[in-house]
Structure formats: structure tokens, C-alpha cells
């Protein structure tokens, strides 16, 4: 089993914030691949399904960003999921909007959700799907940027991008990370 976690904040008014792009990604994966209805457990919401022959547990921590690791740790321990089988979808300031990169391990780069996961898991050696939201230009504008909605002009591209991520998910399930990134880029173009 693989654990795919989308990071975000649970408030309904925050659902379209840039910081919630991880939630948006796992919601689209669940929808496109006919996963089970979301249910509350592990201090979050989970949905289960199969992609590319691989059983996937989707998780949206309902603990707010700063405590996301608590929820991920509970799910990983319950199902005995190794760190190499954990993937987190999160917003990334240092990538332009619409760009996506995958890496394993590394630092939190100021991201409180990743920092929480690093504290709660045995270490930082899980996979990260870094979803670019762009940088507002000055550090004083970062909070307003990540806690703001996507611009109306970005919405069509955002929807194509989320659909591309869901459509390419079978490659991610097989851990074909380079092929996944390439397919997302091609489908979202």
C-alpha cells in the first residue's frame, strides 16, 4: 500500500487557497480514479482505491498545516507504510505556477506542513510532489500569497494541471517519477 497525502488547511473558506493545492490534487485523483468516499480517521480524511495495480490510501490531514505530520504518522503506523511508499503533494513557492517537481527527502524549505511531517516521521525520506504556486516577489507578501485564492486567470490552467496529475497518477503509483513529471507537463500544456 502507498500513502499519498495532500497538504492543506481544513477550513471551507480556504479550499481554493494556493496553500491547499495538495488537497486539490488528491481530491482530483480520488474523483478521476473512482476512489471510495472520503471518511474521517487518522485526524484527517481518507479515501482508498487502486491505481496502476497499486493500492493507494489518499489522506487529507484535518489538523491544519502546522500539525499535518500527526495525521500522516497515524496512518503510516496503522498500515505499516514505509517512508519510501509515502508521497506528499504540497505547494512550492520556489517553482513557477504550473511547474511540478518530485524529489525524495530534503529540508522543509520553510514549509510548515513538511516541517511537521519531518518531526513526526522517522526522517525526511518520503517523496514530495512539489507543486509550483510561484513567489509573490517579496518575503513580506508570502503569507498573503499562500493564503490567497488562485487568480481567476489561473483557474483554467489550474484545472488542466490537476487533471493532468490525476491522469498521470498510474506512473506515480509505479514510482516512475520522471515519466510522471513528463506526462503531467505534456497533458497540462
Swiss-Prot record:
An example molecular function term from Gene Ontology annotations: peptidyl-tRNA hydrolase activity
Residues bound to tRNA: 64, 66, 112
Localization per record: Cytoplasm
Reaction(s) this enzyme catalyzes, per UniProt: an N-acyl-L-alpha-aminoacyl-tRNA + H2O = an N-acyl-L-amino acid + a tRNA + H(+)
Gene Ontology cellular component list: cytoplasm
Glycosyltransferase keyword on record: no
Position of the signal peptide: none
Record-marked site positions (Stabilizes the basic form of H active site to accept a proton): 91
NCBIfam families assigned: pth (TIGR00447)
Function: Hydrolyzes ribosome-free peptidyl-tRNAs (with 1 or more amino acids incorporated), which drop off the ribosome during protein synthesis, or as a result of ribosome stalling. Catalyzes the release of premature peptidyl moieties from peptidyl-tRNA molecules trapped in stalled 50S ribosomal subunits, and thus maintains levels of free tRNAs and 50S ribosomes.
Protein name: Peptidyl-tRNA hydrolase
Gene source species: Gluconobacter oxydans (strain 621H) (Gluconobacter suboxydans)
Amino acid at each position: 500500500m502507498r500513502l499519498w497525502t495532500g497538504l492543506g488547511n481544513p477550513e471551507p473558506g480556504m479550499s481554493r487557497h494556493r496553500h491547499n493545492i495538495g488537497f486539490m490534487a488528491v481530491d482530483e485523483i480520488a474523483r478521476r480514479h473512482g476512489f471510495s468516499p472520503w471518511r474521517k480517521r487518522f485526524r484527517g480524511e481518507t479515501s482508498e482505491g487502486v491505481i496502476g495495480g497499486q493500492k493507494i490510501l489518499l489522506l487529507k490531514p484535518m489538523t491544519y498545516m502546522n500539525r499535518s505530520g500527526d495525521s500522516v504518522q497515524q496512518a503510516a503506523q496503522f498500515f505499516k507504510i514505509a517512508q519510501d511508499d509515502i508521497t506528499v503533494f504540497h505547494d512550492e513557492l520556489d517553482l513557477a505556477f504550473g511547474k511540478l517537481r518530485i524529489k525524495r527527502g530534503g529540508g522543509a524549505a520553510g514549509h510548515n506542513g513538511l516541517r511537521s511531517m519531518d518531526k513526526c516521521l522517522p526522517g525526511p525520506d518520503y517523496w514530495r510532489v512539489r507543486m509550483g504556486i510561484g513567489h509573490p516577489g517579496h518575503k513580506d507578501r508570502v503569507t498573503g500569497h499562500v493564503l490567497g485564492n488562485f487568480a481567476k486567470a489561473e483557474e483554467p490552467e489550474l484545472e488542466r494541471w490537476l487533471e493532468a496529475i490525476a491522469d498521470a497518477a498510474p506512473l506515480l503509483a509505479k514510482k516512475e517519477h520522471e515519466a510522471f513529471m513528463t506526462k503531467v507537463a505534456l497533458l497540462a500544456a
